[in-house]
Amino acid sequence: AKLQTGTAYLPGKHAPLQWTQFDPLEFLEELKKINYQTDSWEELLNKAEVGQGYMNRPCLNPTDPECPVTAPNKNSTKPPDVALILSGGCYGLSKKYMRWQEELIVGGTVKNSNGTLLRAQALQTMFQLMTPKQMYEHFRGYEDVLHINWNEDKAAAILEAWQRMYVEVVHQSVPQNSTQKVLSFTTTTLDDILKSFSDISVIRVASGYLLMLAYACLTMLRWDCAKSQGAVGLAGVLLVALSVAAGLGLCSLIGIS
């Protein structure tokens, strides 16, 4: 709940509402006291199985002052069994629609014979970003983007820049003498990898074909001209080179890069 940003200020409330102390059911009860119709909201929360939100979830630090009194391990002297809690996955705010699988949370797991999680070597975190089209549609019409000729290409550029900056910040967050390793992977990283494998080095390709040509000629060449097949090897290498060139030309013709 502490990782969830956002603060709401309501009339009559001295403290701002945050996820660490927001109880949806208690909030609806307060709305009922001022004769506010909450039937549709109650139905929505019940269908999504929101309940008390994060208020009835275990705290990582039971002695934390912000740990709600409704937490099952409030003021407990024992640390929570995180492995048991994460075994099989865990739930977000909605127990019906926000279930995070165990494979998306931890890695390098060790389990007992019953499949219960005992320990893990890595903690995983995932951020789901908008697609360029979704981001363009979301901010279209905002005054902040009117002066930059807002379009999908600019949205894609912003998403790419954010991912690159995120990777850089993550790598800088770990001290050099730390025993822990932080690995980051984004769609931009995947695109860079694919691009690096797609780039064709003329020197490397030419060197490779020259080596193939020399190998084919030397292995098939004989001193006896009647038994020598060096020309066949030369023709075979040239045929392969022309086939590859034709394939690349066809890909370029149909727009595959």
From Swiss-Prot:
Keyword Transmembrane appears in the UniProt entry: yes
All copies of domain SSD, residue ranges: 201-257
Residue intervals annotated with topology Extracellular: 1-199
A single MF term (Gene Ontology): hedgehog receptor activity
UniProt PTM: Glycosylation is necessary for SHH binding.
Record keywords, A-Z: Glycoprotein, Membrane, Receptor, Transmembrane, Transmembrane helix
Record topology, Cytoplasmic segments: 221-235
Entry's localization field: Membrane
Residues carrying covalently attached carbohydrate according to the record: N75, N114, N177
Up-regulation conditions: Activated by Sonic hedgehog.
Membrane topology: Multi-pass membrane protein
Tissue: In the eye, detected in neural retina, iris, retinal pigment epithelium, but not in lens.
Parts of the chain that traverse the membrane: 200-220, 236-256
Role noted for this protein: Acts as a receptor for sonic hedgehog (SHH), indian hedgehog (IHH) and desert hedgehog (DHH). Associates with the smoothened protein (SMO) to transduce the hedgehog's proteins signal.
Family: Belongs to the patched family.
Protein name: Protein patched homolog 1
